[in-house]
Amino acid sequence: MKLYKKRGIIYIHSTFNNTISTLTDVFGNTIVWYSAGILGYKGPKKSTSLASQLISEKITISILKNNIKVVDIYIKGLGLGKETTLRIINNSGIFIRSITDITPIPHNGCRKKKKRRV
């Protein structure tokens, strides 16, 4: 039987209002997910870097509980939480195989609204 290290994928969705982190296996099945609202933060406190720090600590605890050794990280969004989350996961001793930014960038998508004339 082939021995392999258990792998996982972390999706970090960071907006200006919230940070959502999802831990999945290689096939895309969700193992655990956390957001600032789950941890008890409401309103403007959800967008702080402290909330994203607690989210990433919870994710690293669940990675260690599930015996995951290798992690791929996908980051989406422009919020404050992505750098904090990356730093904490990197310092936890988990091997990060790749970090990919999947933030959608429009290539001149929808037409802008007309300018307001006063």
From Swiss-Prot:
Gene Ontology MF terms: rRNA binding; structural constituent of ribosome
Database matches in Gene3D superfamilies: Ribosomal protein S11
Any coiled-coil regions, as ranges: none
One Pfam family this sequence matches: Ribosomal_S11
Cellular component, GO, one term: ribosome
GO terms for biological process, alphabetical: translation
Keywords (A to Z) from UniProt: Ribonucleoprotein, Ribosomal protein, RNA-binding, rRNA-binding
Domain of life of the organism encoding this protein: Bacteria
Family indicated by similarity: Belongs to the universal ribosomal protein uS11 family.
Subunit and partners: Part of the 30S ribosomal subunit. Interacts with proteins S7 and S18. Binds to IF-3.
Protein purpose: Located on the platform of the 30S subunit, it bridges several disparate RNA helices of the 16S rRNA. Forms part of the Shine-Dalgarno cleft in the 70S ribosome.
Name the UniProt record assigns to this protein: Small ribosomal subunit protein uS11
Organism whose genome encodes this protein: Carsonella ruddii (strain PV)
Source organism phylogeny: Bacteria, Pseudomonadati, Pseudomonadota, Gammaproteobacteria, Oceanospirillales
